[in-house]
Structures are given as C-alpha cells and as structure tokens.
Design a protein with these regions (language model features):
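Long, histidine/aromatic-enriched segments associated with O2/redox biology
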Residues: 1-272, 276-292, 296
Length: 300
C-alpha cells in the first residue's frame, strides 16, 4: 500500500508458546481503532466512521474480526479489576513511551500497536474468593491498590507484566484495553490494545506471561483468560500518507531487522492460528505488507 521502507520493528507477530498457554498469531494488514469517551458518540459517530471506512475499502479488504468494547464501571475489566492502572496518564508521559523518536526518523511520531482478543471463563473465575482473585491479579479488587511485594505471588498478573531493565528503569506502555461481551452468547473478554515505541517491551511481557521467567512461572490469569487473536501493527503519524516515498518496500519477516535488536527474548514459536470466524487466514503474499489478508486483486 505504501512504497517506503517499513518501520524498523514492523514484522509479523510471532506466536509465543509455553507449556500450557499460547499467545497465538492471527495476522492482519489493517487495524482501525475507533473510540469515543461518550456512549452516544460511540453509537453514532464511531459506527458511521466504521461504515464509511469499509465502504471506501469495498473489494480491497476482507474484515476478519470486529469487536465493540465499552467502559465498564470505573474502567474495570469483566473480571472486576481496574484495567490499565499503570498506563501513563498525561500526554507527555504517554508520548515518551509510545511514540517512535530519532531512532527511526522516517517514522518519528508513529507508534507500534499489539492487539490481542482474550476470552474469559467467568464461571470459573467467579467461583474463586475475592482473596484468591487478588492473589492472581496482584491488586486489591475494590481499592485497586497493588499488593505488597511480600504478599504478591511471583506468578500474579502484575508481577508478570512488570518489566525492569538491568539499569533499574521500569518499562511502560500505553494501554487502551476494552472489555467486551454478549450475555446471550455467553462470550466475555478483554481486547488488549498496547501502544509502544518498541514492540519488544510488550513481547517481553507476553513471554513472561505465557512462557514464564523462570520458565514455567506463567501468569495465573491465563488459567481463566485465553488469547484467540494476536497481531502487530504500526500506527503512522498523521502526515504519513502525504510524504513522497520512492523506495520499494522491504519484505516482512518474523526476524528483527539488523541494527534494531528487540528488547524481548526470542519467543517460542507456535502454529499460526485461524481467524476468530474459523476461516483460515489468507496466505502471506509478497506484493502486500506480507502480514495478513489484504486483497490486492483490486487496483486503486
């Protein structure tokens, strides 16, 4: 779609497989994250924008998943805990961790985004006591206060997703997760959306969750939440499409480009999963971005 060299860390999302749980890969070419802070705007403007986008892309893409999220109480997930507590709150803090900088000047101001759709076993979760749930998450349920280190399990969700560099720097990402669900169908989940200047940060979080550090010390929340999708995208700066780009695009591979090492350990590979609809995903083609199901048979 765009004939410039790809962003330094843009590649197919590599599945991460542990002994019991797998972060699956379900590649796609385009992600539209449409959000509003008011319900009436979600129902009106967000729907209309989505409708117009798909009309403009008619025949060029095949939608493989659509999720309608919502705000649940005081920004809680359907497990009952506040979600995104550690996400940066100010624009300045968010920009510092989410936006690409001088390390990749052609894409400065853009951001990588990893998305995963998790389905929850709420029946099993709700059979636990609040104290058991708090040990799994690593926070008090009502107050959202993090448990003291002495009381926090090493395989709690908070412990698994805390990334500390060797120099003591805590690595953050911008989370914009959405709870979703349909009571009639009995489907309840969390749509994880993580923005970062370096996808290796999220990949290391996922490695700690699904494989464990040390190996086997996996995130207990995965006993109740199953990842059914997983994909890595790049969100370009607003003026991206207006820029001239005479250079042919580079092919997408699963490997990190030379000169841009990731901060994550090498993930354990697992088979590429099918789309949530049960239909197999399109074969990767060399004439597209190479990471999904974009239909290039139509010319624009």
């Amino acid at each position: 779609m765009y004939d410039a060299p790809r962003p330094a860390h843009l590649r197919a999302f590599v599945p991460i497989s542990g002994a019991e749980h797998t972060a699956v890969s379900t590649p796609g070419d385009l992600l539209f994250h449409i959000r509003a802070t008011r319900l009436d705007l979600c129902l009106d403007l967000c729907f209309e924008l989505c409708h117009q986008l798909l009309r403009s892309l008619n025949g060029l893409v095949q939608p493989v998943d659509e999720v309608h999220g919502f705000r649940y109480w005081d920004e809680r997930d359907l497990l009952g805990f506040v979600d995104g507590t550690e996400s940066p709150r100010s624009d300045r803090e968010a920009s510092a961790v989410a936006l690409v900088g001088a390390e990749d000047p052609a894409y400065a101001g853009g951001s990588y985004v990893i998305v995963q759709k998790y389905l929850h076993d709420l029946e099993a979760w709700e059979r636990l006591s609040v104290a058991e749930q708090e040990q799994i998450v690593g926070r008090e349920k009502l107050s959202d206060v993090e448990l003291p280190d002495a009381a926090k399990a090493s395989n709690s969700h908070v412990a698994a997703t805390t990334i500390i560099d060797p120099d003591g720097t805590a690595r953050q990402i911008v989370r914009d997760n959405m709870p979703f669900g349909t009571a009639a169908a009995g489907e309840f989940g969390t749509y994880f959306i993580g923005y970062t200047a370096d996808p290796g940060v999220i990949e290391r979080m996922l490695h700690r969750m699904f494989v464990g550090e040390p190996t086997g010390n996996t995130d207990r929340i995965l006993d109740f939440s199953t990842a059914v999708t997983g994909c890595l995208f790049f969100a370009p700066p607003a003026d991206f499409l207006a820029r001239p780009s005479p250079t042919p695009p580079a092919a997408i591979t699963d490997e990190e480009p030379t000169g841009h090492p990731t901060t994550a350990p090498p993930p354990t590979r697992a088979p590429i999963a099918e789309a949530p609809t049960g239909k197999p995903l399109a074969v990767i083609r060399t004439d597209s971005l190479g990471i999904g199901s974009l239909n290039r048979s139509s010319k624009s």
